[in-house]
């Protein structure tokens, strides 16, 4: 009875000492002679966890803590106490804890961690560790010596995947995983470089890999399998693996790396896209650099004789002669340069709108008898030329006496000669508007009045397709003759003129460059020009609008390149001094011209990247169908004066790619059903 009271008093004391001391869930962990099952119950109650205790768990707990513990520390303390007494805690999926013997824990449903996952404390876990460079078959026995195999610890390995499974307390498992990580790194440095003098590194790797394949290769761990990498830049082979295997492979490589019986290595490379002549200079520069880096110590002339690069234009191919290492480098360069280059469709819109109003009113005076004139340069016609033309246009009458053979007077005959209107027509041809001539005695007045109203709206849409980084030029216009000089003969009997021709119209020059992200950089030179005034070879004036720029545009995006807005108000007046200033009457001695002009010019551009034949075919079909639709519209309207005439029309797009009659009939039948 006394023994029972004594035992109960100790249990009560342990319970009081382990109760929370504050609302912050701090615990005092001191137990003396407490039954282990009671100890487990106290901890479960304090942590509010459900704990299932194996019936084989028996004993007493003696432990003292002088510091208060928080909830996490208290749980770690609980695990450590059970570990000391040979028990372990296994947490199930539903959060319930099981307390069992340590040796039984490794066969229970304990947590499984892999990769960088980690656990702490004395919790029993299983860690999966992947080993890359060391054989797990050799590593496992070493690890078993560092773990409690009689308790919860255990180490097993799986050869095909070269992995290790470690079961035990979390702290011990973490320590073994760290040991594996450090040991596994040592294998990464076991790499040897074998330089080749004659053979090609890539070809040597292919041969050695074929010879190294054995019947038991599938059962060999990945770590023990040798690995080969060809470094074509230095023409060497990198070998990793077991030292004995590496040594055997090095001997094999040296036996194969011998000089060829026939010196020289010739190769003909047929190009698919690049131009052979363009690649010759590039390859010569590459080969010279490779020979300089190789540094064989041979004379410069000997080195150059080793490499020969020529282009065969008829077959668009390259003929190469070089040592194997340089040959491989040049073939790699050719493979990277001989690619299908993208194309760019450049569509431009040039919009020019102009309107103008003007009026001209003037009076000119002239006298044939005295030769006096009052004329102005802004009227378009000179009264002097008009007066001369009028005088030459008059009929002339002549009277002539007629005599017989004996010189006897018979009669007078009168003949009238028609006037010459050539001079008058030339003078009047330059008149615009209305011109009225009034004769007052010897003086003649020429009144000229004209009013003009002009408006134009010009839309030009040139388009051109060009290769990436290629230059394309486009011109639509005409060549205008311009006199550049004149020379007379020695006796002024054979004068001649030198004439140059100037291109006038719409010019477009583009160099596109496709950049990352389907953006296109465009270097553009654009010009719009036309002839001003009479279309002759003397005093020809040209109007030119030119734009030079470099822009970045997204694929399929339209961008405005520039514009010009020009407004002019012009007024000119020519008059006779003093007389032209007289009110009202002064209008008879002056010529006035007023003009208002307004021009708008805008240039837009849109690039479209064409990377394949499908895109090119779609763009071509769109343009083709547009022209064909215009022709069909005109054909439907017909010709006004030729009812029976037929208007030519393009065939349907794709008719040139028709199939055999049987297949084509089937396709047309299916299209008709749709």
Curated annotation (Swiss-Prot):
Where do the record's region annotations for N1 lie?
123-187
Q: Which Gene3D superfamilies match?
A: 3.30.1370.120
Question: What Pfam family does this protein match (any one)?
Answer: Secretin
Give the protein's biological function. Answer: Involved in a type II secretion system (T2SS, formerly general secretion pathway, GSP) for the export of proteins. Required for secretion of cholera toxin through the outer membrane. This subunit forms the outer membrane channel.
List where in the cell it is found.
Answer: Cell outer membrane
Q: Where is this region: N0?
A: 25-121
InterPro entries according to UniProt: Bact_Secretion_Sys_Channel (IPR050810), GspD-like_N0 (IPR049371), GspD/PilQ (IPR001775), NolW-like (IPR005644), NolW-like_sf (IPR038591), T2SS/T3SS_dom (IPR004846), T2SS_GspD (IPR013356), T2SS_GspD_CS (IPR004845)
Give the keywords, sorted. Cell outer membrane, Membrane, Protein transport, Signal, Transmembrane, Transmembrane beta strand, Transport
Give the residue ranges for region: Cap gate. 395-417
The uppermost taxa in this organism's lineage are:
Bacteria, Pseudomonadati, Pseudomonadota, Gammaproteobacteria, Vibrionales
Molecular function GO labels:
identical protein binding
Region entry N3, spans: 264-338
Note down the stretches annotated as region N2.
Answer: 188-261
- NCBIfam families registered for this protein in UniProt: type_II_gspD
The terms describing its cellular component in GO are: cell outer membrane; type II protein secretion system complex
Gene that produces this protein: epsD
What interactions and quaternary structure are annotated? Forms a cylindrical channel with 15 subunits; unlike E.coli no 16-subunit channels are seen. The closed pentadeacameric channels are 195 Angstroms long and 145 Angstroms in diameter. Each subunit turns in a clock-wise manner around the channel.
Free-text note on domains in this protein's UniProt record:
The N0, N1, N2 and N3 domains are periplasmic, while the secretin and S domains form a channel that is partially inserted in the outer membrane. The cap gate extends out on the extracellular side of the channel partially closing the channel. The secretin domain forms a double beta-barrel structure; the outer barrel has an outer diameter of about 110 Angstroms while the inner barrel forms the central gate with a small pore in the closed state.
Q: What PANTHER family does the entry give?
A: PROBABLE GENERAL SECRETION PATHWAY PROTEIN D (PTHR30332), SECRETIN GSPD-RELATED (PTHR30332:SF24)
One record GO biological process: protein secretion
Q: For site (May serve as a pivot that allows opening of the central gate for substrate egress), what residue positions does UniProt give? A: 477
Record's protein name: Secretin GspD
The record lists the organism as: Vibrio cholerae serotype O1 (strain ATCC 39315 / El Tor Inaba N16961)
User: Which portions of the sequence form the region S domain?
Assistant: 614-674
